Amino acid sequence: MLPYPQIDPVALAIGPLKIHWYGLMYLIGIGGAWLLASRRLNRFDPTWSREKLSDLVFWLSMGVIVGGRLGYVLFYDLHAYLANPTLIFEVWKGGMSFHGGFIGVMLAALWFGKRNNKSFFELMDFVAPLVPIGLGAGRIGNFINAELWGKPTDVPWAMIFPPFSDPAQLPRHPSQLYQFALEGVALFVILWLFSRKPRPTMAVSGMFALFYGIFRFIVEFVRVPDAQLGYIAWGWLTMGQILCVPMILAGLGLIWWAYNRKPTAKPA
């Protein structure tokens, strides 16, 4: 069994102001995505300035934050937030939905593309390889917060999370680290290598949807579902898995469509 590193969720406190690691992970994810996007900017559109790229990253980040929070409210805990709407603003306590953030990003990309003469999938193909940076950082934030841990297990790398998070004090799968490895590292490598060569429009977006859906679906088998929801069906199906099914199907559909229509190869 591995010891859980006791990390204070507050990274820095200046008087009453507290800066949480969870929030810093979002900044790291956004900053890392911007740096990598700037490396590929000329391939995407040589006429774009760094300022326009910054605008794109800003609006997509807003989509992630707003969509992620609203998605969690709608998909995972609507009753609690209807009872106390101010909880929506307590983002440092966690409670973000990837699927909600993904919808927010799509809406932001659609809006930004129309204003800048770019198609929706042109932007999504450009952005998709950058997303795992934020996903990986977010999962590290979950780990530091000692939240979203896995089921009890006797594997050698099991961890006992702090009592405030897990009163049962059982050795558990560190499922946040599994998601970091799959959704952050593995997904980044797959998309970054795949998008290094010109691909048909929609192919990179399809690869993202397909592999994220597969990775998340797999990890959900060892991750404890949100207490207020539990399992949706059959004693094992979670809300996360339900939301991943359309992503997997959409990913397969986009890849098939990309390679079976008239080829229009463009750099991602």
Swiss-Prot record:
Keywords: Cell inner membrane, Cell membrane, Membrane, Transferase, Transmembrane, Transmembrane helix. The chain crosses the membrane at residues 10-30, 56-76, 92-112, 120-140, 174-194, 202-222, 236-256. GO terms for cellular component: plasma membrane. Its EC number is 2.5.1.145. Coiled coil: none annotated. GO terms for biological process: lipoprotein biosynthetic process. GO terms for molecular function: phosphatidylglycerol-prolipoprotein diacylglyceryl transferase activity. A 1,2-diacyl-sn-glycero-3-phospho-(1'-sn-glycerol) binds at residue 139. InterPro entries: Lgt. Its main location: membrane. It is a multi-pass membrane protein. It holds the Pfam family LGT. It is found in: Cell inner membrane. Pathway: Protein modification; lipoprotein biosynthesis (diacylglyceryl transfer). It is an enzyme of class 2 (transferase). Belongs to the Lgt family. NCBIfam families: lgt. Catalyzes the transfer of the diacylglyceryl group from phosphatidylglycerol to the sulfhydryl group of the N-terminal cysteine of a prolipoprotein, the first step in the formation of mature lipoproteins. This is Phosphatidylglycerol--prolipoprotein diacylglyceryl transferase. The gene is lgt.
